[in-house]
C-alpha cells in the first residue's frame, strides 16, 4: 500500500528528509486506516485529531525543508518569466511613450519656430512701414 501511494505521489523534492517523513506519514496513515476499519477502541474524533495533527506536522516539514529548493526554483522561474514579459512588453511601451514625447516635442519646437518666424516677419513689416511713414 505504501509503494502504491508513493507511485501516485508526484515528488518535486527528492531529498532524504522528504523520503523519511513521507514514509513515516504513510505508515501512520496505514495504522489509522487499520484502526478505523477494525473499530478498535478509539473514537472517530480522536482519529481525526491525530490525522489533522500529523497533516500539520507533514505540512510544516514541507514548509521548513521544501522552501529552500522548491520555492527558490519557483522564484527563479517567476523572476525569469516576469523579466521576459517586462522586456518584451513594458520596454516597448516605454519606447513608444518616449517616441510620442519626442514627437510632441518636435511638433512644439516646429510650432514655436513658425511663431518666431511669423513674429520676425511681422516685426520686419512693421519696421519697414514705420520707416516708410517717416520718410
Swiss-Prot record:
Membrane topology term: Multi-pass membrane protein
Keyword Cell wall biogenesis/degradation appears in the UniProt entry: no
Predominant location: host cell
Transmembrane segments: 20-40, 47-67
Compartments it resides in: Host membrane
Top-rank lineage group of the source organism: Viruses
Gene Ontology CC entries for this record: host cell membrane; membrane
Protein keywords: Host membrane, Membrane, Transmembrane, Transmembrane helix
Protein family membership: Belongs to the plectrovirus ORF5 family.
Protein's recorded name: Uncharacterized protein ORF5
Species classification: Viruses, Monodnaviria, Loebvirae, Hofneiviricota, Faserviricetes
